[in-house]
Amino acid sequence: MNKAILILYFSSRKLKRAGLKMRRPFHKKRPVGAFITPQDTVDSIIEHPVLVEEKAKIYPRSKENDIMAIQTLDKFASGFSKTTGQIYADGLNAIIKNHGNKVRVYRQIYSEEEIKKDSTKAHASLHYFPSEKKSKFIIVCPGGAYANCEALSEGYPLAVHLNGLGYTAFVLSYRVREEANNLAPVEDLAAAVRYVLDHADELNIVPEDYAVLGFSAGGHLVGCYGLDKIGYKKFNLPKPGTIMIAYGLISTEKFPHCNKLILGPEPDEKAVIAISIDRNITPDYPPVFFWAGKNDLLLDYRHHGDELEKAVRMNEIPYEYHLYEKAQHGISLGIGTEAEGWVDKAAAFWAKHSMNEHSVNVHSANDYSAK
């Protein structure tokens, strides 16, 4: 949580104790095709007609006294290294632009029959960011501690960047909070992959050698997807060409905060170990690119990035691990930090380990791939 949010948070608490509410700013009705600017408030963006229609995930809290409501995108972004609100605006504007080009951005990944049996599945979806040409695809899983899905900062901006590298990108909104029990997010990722593969022609994608990318809890999600017992094999899906993890949760034993959300209220030790990625890597695990920051105050790199490196090295999995001295948690693209450019390195790693003729020619970075 950045300083600006903290200030607003404590201000809102004082107002609550006084029986008052933070005033929501007045917004004129926005034209349907209007683009977002960094000076727009979160509250006004939530009401944008196109973003409402495409069910964009802006921010999970939108009540009248919400501390986020009065912040501009620039203010919201100010707590994350040198990221500016323009990065977030670009992600949202890509949705608006695609919608204007008659692209159906929002995609329901479960059938009506599946949703009828389990209504929580209606809350899992994809947002589609097409490449200009037929290409390989990647599914981006934002973080949020399995309590939220932070697509605004860790989803849409990544999709735009990946489009620029020549890939078709999808941003997954998976089930969170109590709906995440029984590893529902992993099921959602599997359903998303199946949806894309089943609609390959319509979506103009190459079905082979796809990638999955995740941040923080989303990193844990994509990491689990690569495991033999609970991942892609369980759902009879093809093996991903590459897994990409940014400041990811790896050891659930060392960070039990999320366990009750994805396993249930009283998970036993055996269940926790089963979703600890470092404890379940096998020689058939997909090639993996991952990075961590020594200045990450939420997920200690020694318990997560370093432990994953030990596991993949032991199993001779092709991998690339970057450990940044000053990188913090939640910096997404890493703009203005030593981590900036990591997405391009990850794409180069993906291309290097691909046997697909549609691989994008991205400049390759040095890596620590097992021989």
Language-model features: where?
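Primarily recognizes the serine-hydrolase "nucleophile elbow" in alpha/beta-hydrolase
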Residues: A191-L261, V272-I273
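Conserved alpha/beta-hydrolase "acid-adjacent" motif
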Residues: L297-D306
